[in-house]
Structure formats: C-alpha cells, structure tokens
Swiss-Prot record:
It comes from the Bacteria. PANTHER family: 50S RIBOSOMAL PROTEIN L9 (PTHR21368). One of its GO terms (biological process) is translation. SUPFAM superfamilies: L9 N-domain-like, Ribosomal protein L9 C-domain. GO terms for cellular component: ribonucleoprotein complex; ribosome. Binds to the 23S rRNA. Belongs to the bacterial ribosomal protein bL9 family. InterPro entries: Ribosomal_bL9, Ribosomal_bL9/RNase_H1_N, Ribosomal_bL9_bac/chp, Ribosomal_bL9_C, Ribosomal_bL9_C_sf, Ribosomal_bL9_N, Ribosomal_bL9_N_sf. Keywords: Ribonucleoprotein, Ribosomal protein, RNA-binding, rRNA-binding. This is Large ribosomal subunit protein bL9. The lineage of its organism: Bacteria, Bacillati, Cyanobacteriota, Cyanophyceae, Oscillatoriophycideae. One of its GO terms (molecular function) is structural constituent of ribosome.
C-alpha cells in the first residue's frame, strides 16, 4: 500500500478541502499536480505553525466582525423606528413601494452607519403605516426594526 503525504492546501479544491486545510493525499497526486500547480505545500512543522497563526488571525477577525455587528444591532434597536416619506394617493395608498435601498438610506441618515441593502428584508408595503423589517448584519446577528411610512 502506498504511503500518504500530508499537504497544506493553498486554495480550495473540490472534494479535497479548502484553503489552509491539512489533507493527506497520494504522493503522486501531490508531486505531479498539487505542488507544481502551487495548489498545495508540503506539510512541514514551519508551514503548520504558519497555518495555525493564519487560522487564529481569521478567528480574531471574525470575532471582531461579530462584535461590531452586535454594536450595530444595539444602535438600530435603540432607535427602533425609522421614517420613510412617500407620495400618497387615495386611501393612504403610496405611489410605488418601499425598497430595501430606501430603508438602508433611512438607517444611514439616522445612525451614520452603512447597512448592506441585500441584508434587509422588507414586507410588501403599499400603504402608509408601521411595518417590521429585519436587518441581517452578520450571519449570526439580525436586528428587527420598525419602519414608519408617512405621507410626503
């Protein structure tokens, strides 16, 4: 039976692993494909130490992002209500609809913090009144805000 070789991946490879993973592969696969294409590096103690340091930095970065998102969530839920003014027709029906871009602009105007409009979920709004929207600030952090649609 052939001996397996440990390599550290430099890129994500389908069905093998993602960047920074330590994997065992056949020596021929490593020697003939992974190493010449610079898709992997032989696993030496120095390389393993670098990989561990890179993972720790990534963990710290993700933790900092989550803490920043928690702070944004607190700010949004403290303000709680954001007002959007729209032109109104008969029976409090608004012209057009309230878009996620308009909600993002209202949040930015009130908090001076940019929010990605793609993370905002707004119900179908076609009348004036109060509506709830969710803002996804991070994969693990979601804030619920209230949108007031008022006449212009």
């Amino acid at each position: 039976m052939a001996k397996r070789v440990q390599v550290v991946l430099n890129e994500s490879i389908n069905k093998l692993g993602k960047d920074g993973d330590l994997v065992e592969v056949a020596p021929g696969y490593a020697r003939n494909y992974l190493l010449p294409q610079k898709l992997a590096t032989l696993a030496t103690p120095g390389i393993l130490k670098q990989v561990e340091q890179r993972r720790e930095k990534e963990r710290q970065r993700l933790l900092a992002e989550k803490q920043q998102a928690e702070g944004q969530k607190t700010a949004l839920e403290t303000i709680k209500r954001f007002t959007i003014r729209k032109e109104v027709g008969e029976g409090e029906a608004i012209f057009g609809t309230v878009t996620t871009s308009e909600v993002a602009e209202a949040i930015q105007a009130a908090t001076n913090q940019e929010v990605d409009r793609k993370g905002i979920t707004v119900p179908d709004i076609n009348k004036t009144g109060f509506y709830e929207a969710t803002v996804k600030l991070h994969p693990e952090v979601t804030a619920t805000i209230e949108i007031q649609v008022a006449p212009l």
